[in-house]
């Protein structure tokens, strides 16, 4: 039996199989809480980020030293250490400065990108490049995997055209058949980084200790530079470049302006540039970094590559004793492409290996897919580098809040609190019908309540029981309340659609151009996907409004909640996944703020298996460092005073929209 995942957002990936005794489901940190959705984000540690810990100046080597290194292409670059360090310091200072004022984020991005391009130009030809193509190293990868205890029977690596490389069945494989396993010793993990040449620096640097994804990125770079590395067959098989927004040209990023995803894209670039500058200085000045192979060559392109490699591939696995989770790169398994379905991979602690069962029946020569999780297309584009056209989990986010200056604020906040909903919150509009979750339905109902209705839900008969009906579409507060909330949704969606610089029709026309670059196509697809969700929300709001207006005009009786109707609360049409409003199910679906231990499930069986998601963002940051590593720009939630005020200004939204599949990253 396959175990369906509760939710996955920014992780590609996998959860448990039916033979599991214990299935642990993990979620990523999300923008709704303290940790941002940007990969590898950290803010200025006082006295650290602007100037990494350093040894005396004498340990930096001769100031007249000149670096020259040839790449695989034969190009070379000559630049003095002092000149490079000045540029790096300028970049670090720019990226560590206070967040720009609203509307100035693009200007800041241009400035940061300009500095990065100066650095890249001076570093041209200094990056490590393997000869040949990645395809040349696939046979070596398969042999290495087999020699080290992985299963290699039943599939091979093949090119699937627009989807890129993936796993191809070499025999018939049945659904739920265990066809792939990877032992721990093959994985690149935070623990293996601690036991490597990076260990000394790790033990002394707080950022590495707090952010496993950063550690994994530097671990990958150090091993790539080591010709005797155990993981070299795996590293050589990785793409030489990616299609994450870190690789977009400026004009390609510009196509995302006005979308709800653009802020995450800009933050991702800024954070990556800041981290590169910080670690460049650290590698050059810290005594514990003196033996790192990065000391002689550590380019921005190198770091961008390692960040993208980790961001598109990392996953959480249990430590050897099973007491906690750690981050890992999983060779061979990460060749699987994504499709809709269920999580079918887990970690078997007894055999100490990752195990993957078939999502469905596969015939010989068919591509073998896995399900990366319930990610939005914005998450796929930003963290995986592809757009998934048939994404049944696509959504955009909308920030809503009850204005504290509103006369009824205290009453509304109290009703919402009893329902487990904050007075200001990030919600999601979904691509499917209905477009709103039970939590959002409950919020809008409370938001639109009159004073008498609020009193009824606070002090009236069966007030406690009524709270349970707030997220259930079967039990309206009143016809007037339903009309108000659906009018609000209709108006809000219409206003948000007006913020885009292009229409859906114009986007579709642009996508027909044959000379469109891959990244431009993905950006436009993501932009269009956001609009389509808003258009569906508008249409749904209008249809619902008209329906309830008709009921009101006809004098239809209002359905009343009875205790005998409890079954309806567990099978509501409002959202099959989100039935009871007291559960913060919107957070579960979007991966926002859910602690890992809340995803622990006990199943019948004998083995211990951890279910996992392939992460795109990294592991949670410890509480004591969260404030220090949350230097991203987050728009304040909209404070909405009344229905009239709502229609006069737009809601400040941050959504994860999506775009279409990226041939490279979908396959890699």
Where do the protein language model's features map onto the residues?
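N-terminal chloroplast transit peptides
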Residues: 2-14
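Long, positively charged leader/targeting segments at protein N-termini
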Residues: 2-3, 38-186, 191-194, 222-668
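Flexible phosphate/Mg2+-sensing switch loops adjacent to catalytic phosphate-binding sites
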Residues: 188, 195-211, 553
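E2/UBC-UEV (E2-variant) core
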Residues: 204-208, 217-220, 400
């Amino acid at each position: 039996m396959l175990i369906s995942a509760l939710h996955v957002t920014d992780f590609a990936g996998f959860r448990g199989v039916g033979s599991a005794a214990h299935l642990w489901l993990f979620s990523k940190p999300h923008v709704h809480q303290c940790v941002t959705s940007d990969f590898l984000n950290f803010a200025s540690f006082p006295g650290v980020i602007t100037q990494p810990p350093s040894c005396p100046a004498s340990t930096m080597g001769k100031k007249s030293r000149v670096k020259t290194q040839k790449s695989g292409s034969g190009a070379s670059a000559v630049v003095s250490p002092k000149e490079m360090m000045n540029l790096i310091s300028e970049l670090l200072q720019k990226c560590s400065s206070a967040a720009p004022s609203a509307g100035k984020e693009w200007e800041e991005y241009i400035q940061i990108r300009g500095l990065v391009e100066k650095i890249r130009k001076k570093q041209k030809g200094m990056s490590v490049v393997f000869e040949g193509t990645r395809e040349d190293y696939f046979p070596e990868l398969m042999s290495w995997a087999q020699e080290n205890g992985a299963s290699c029977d039943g599939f091979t690596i093949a090119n699937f055209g627009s989807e890129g490389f993936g796993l191809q069945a070499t025999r018939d494989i049945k659904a739920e058949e265990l066809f792939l396993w990877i032992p721990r010793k093959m994985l690149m993990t935070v623990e293996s980084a601690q036991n490597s040449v990076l260990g000394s620096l790790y033990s002394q640097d707080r950022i590495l200790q707090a952010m496993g994804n950063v550690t994994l990125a530097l671990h990958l770079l150090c091993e790539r530079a080591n010709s005797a590395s155990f993981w070299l067959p795996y590293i050589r098989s990785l793409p030489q470049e990616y299609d994450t927004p870190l690789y977009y040209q400026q004009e390609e990023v510009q196509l995302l302006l006005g979308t709800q995803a653009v802020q995450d894209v800009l933050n991702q670039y800024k954070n990556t540039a800041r981290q590169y500058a910080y670690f460049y200085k650290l590698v050059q000045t810290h005594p514990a970094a003196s033996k790192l192979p990065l000391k002689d060559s550590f380019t921005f392109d190198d770091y961008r590559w390692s960040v993208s490699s980790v961001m598109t591939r990392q996953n959480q696995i249990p430590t050897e004793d099973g007491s906690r989770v750690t981050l890992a790169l999983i060779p061979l398994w990460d060749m699987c492409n994504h499709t809709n379905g269920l999580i079918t991979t887990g970690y078997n602690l007894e055999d100490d290996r990752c195990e993957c069962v078939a999502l469905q029946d596969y015939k010989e020569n068919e591509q073998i897919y896995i399900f990366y999780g319930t990610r939005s297309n914005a998450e796929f584009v930003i963290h995986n580098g592809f757009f998934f056209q048939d994404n049944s989990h696509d959504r955009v986010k909308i920030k809503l809040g009850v204005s504290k200056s509103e006369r009824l604020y205290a009453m509304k906040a109290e009703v919402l609190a009893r329902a487990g909903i904050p007075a200001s919150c990030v919600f999601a509009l979904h691509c499917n019908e209905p477009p709103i979750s039970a939590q959002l339905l409950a919020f809008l109902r409370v938001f639109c309540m009159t004073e008498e209705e609020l009193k009824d839900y606070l002090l009236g008969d069966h007030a406690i029981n009524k709270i349970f009906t707030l997220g259930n579409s079967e039990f309206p507060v009143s016809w007037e309340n339903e009309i108000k909330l659906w009018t609000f949704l209709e108006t809000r969606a219409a206003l948000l659609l007006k913020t885009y610089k292009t229409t859906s029709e114009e986007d579709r026309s642009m996508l027909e151009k044959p000379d469109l670059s891959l990244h431009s196509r993905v950006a436009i697809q993501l932009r269009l996907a956001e609009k389509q969700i808003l258009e569906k929300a508008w249409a749904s709001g209008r249809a619902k409004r008209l329906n309830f207006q008709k009921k009101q005009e006809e004098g239809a009786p209002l359905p009343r909640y009875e205790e005998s109707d409890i079954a309806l609360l567990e099978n509501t049409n409002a959202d099959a996944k989100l039935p009871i409003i007291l559960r913060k199910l919107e957070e579960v679906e979007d991966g926002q703020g859910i602690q890992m231990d809340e995803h622990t499930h006990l199943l019948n069986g004998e083995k211990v298996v951890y279910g996992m998601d392939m992460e795109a963002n990294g592991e949670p940051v410890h509480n004591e460092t969260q404030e220090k590593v949350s230097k991203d720009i987050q728009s304040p939630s909209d404070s909405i005073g009344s229905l009239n005020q709502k229609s006069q200004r737009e809601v400040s939204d941050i959504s994860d929209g999506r775009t279409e599949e990226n041939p490279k990253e979908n396959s890699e």
